[in-house]
């Protein structure tokens, strides 16, 4: 849990030991203005190292850490993909070499989150026999500019295949 500040030499150990890193992407964008001063240059190399963890073969469990951060998953997906806050700062993203792709970020909040909860046989994806918990949103998040991901709004929520919110 909270695998956000890891000694760089320990990053490969997650995959080697089958430890599942859990990340809260909005922590990086909330912490970006103070992390350098508080962690120092050496420790910052292993901070919020999502790309390094994925490249080492890890699944990443994404979450919000609500109520510390807001629960909206699109805030976290935006932060994971852009490494920017909701004002889209800094330009190019903070520690941009650690960005995730949109597919990786979506997996971290869906399939891989279910895997981390030992629930991947029941939830996390849409497939026959799964619970069919899903949302409809106001935009095609694959086609929208990454800087706009955080603005995504939920139009409808289905739980167990039944409409619960519209």
Predicted regions and their residues:
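His/Asp/Glu-enriched, well-ordered alpha-helical/loop segment
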Residues: 8-12, 16-143, 147, 152, ...
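Histidine-centered active-site/metal-ligand motif
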Residues: 2
């Amino acid at each position: 849990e909270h695998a956000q500040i890891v000694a760089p030499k320990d990053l490969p150990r997650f995959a080697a030991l089958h430890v599942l890193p859990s990340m809260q992407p909005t922590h990086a964008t909330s912490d970006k203005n103070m992390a350098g001063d508080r962690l120092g240059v050496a420790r910052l190399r292993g901070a919020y190292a999502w790309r390094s963890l994925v490249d080492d073969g890890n699944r990443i469990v994404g979450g919000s850490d609500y109520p510390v951060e807001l629960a909206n998953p699109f805030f976290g997906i935006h932060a994971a993909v852009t490494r920017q806050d909701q004002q889209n700062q800094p330009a190019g993203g903070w520690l941009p070499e650690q960005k995730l792709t949109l597919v990786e970020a979506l997996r971290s909040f869906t399939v891989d989150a279910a895997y981390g909860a030992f629930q991947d046989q029941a939830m996390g994806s849409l497939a026959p026999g799964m619970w069919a918990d899903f949302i409809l949103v106001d935009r095609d998040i694959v086609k929208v500019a990454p800087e706009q991901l955080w603005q995504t709004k939920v139009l409808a929520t289905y739980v167990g295949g039944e409409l619960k919110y519209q």
